[in-house]
Amino acid sequence: MSFRNTSKSSLATIDRLELVMPKYAIRGGEATLKCDHSVPLEQLHKVEWKKSGMKIFQYVKGRTPPFRYFPLAGAELNKEHSSEKQIQLSKLDFPASGSYSCIVSMETPIFSKESESHELTVIEPQDTDPVITFNKDTYEIGEILEANCTTSPARPPPHVTWLINNER
């Protein structure tokens, strides 16, 4: 006599796994990264977060404490807003830019799946409008105009396009 286990849990897989996060975040600000998956909490074993292949956060069900935090250059993990479903990065700086992913592992059956990686770019927008200065106050028709456009520091650097009478 043979027995076959055809229970639903033995056939379970991770049908849905998606990393939801912003593409850009402002330097000094924060970013919330969500690991949206279809694993019921009772079957969830572990969720890991990686930046550029390096582990930065881990949740393991049943471990005390369930969360572990790993060094992350250019950001702090906000412990109050991080869980098995999301992490929040705060005090962002340029080294936090990079590729992020989450890995979800089930208890029964033992199965893991990694999300697609997504890029986060920490930016610093201009804090003032560009300023145009001219070498002279007035110009005669046909005279060569010399001007300078100065922008405030920004990352990525601003792209400057000159228009004269709304034409390039």
For each predicted feature, which ranges?
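Flexible inter-domain hinge/linker segments at boundaries of tandem extracellular adhesion modules
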Residues: 2-19, 50-55, 68-69, 106, ...
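Conserved beta-strand elements of beta-rich interaction domains across eukaryotes
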Residues: 37-38, 54, 94, 107, ...
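Short, surface-exposed binding/anchoring microloops in extracellular/periplasmic proteins
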Residues: 139, 144-146, 153-155
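N-terminal V-set
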Residues: 40-73, 155-168
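Short beta-strand segments of immunoglobulin-like
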Residues: 19-26, 38, 133-139, 151-152
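Ligand-binding face of N-terminal immunoglobulin V-set domains in extracellular IgSF glycoproteins
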Residues: 30, 34-36, 74-119
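Structural beta-strand segments of beta-rich domains
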Residues: 29-33, 143-147
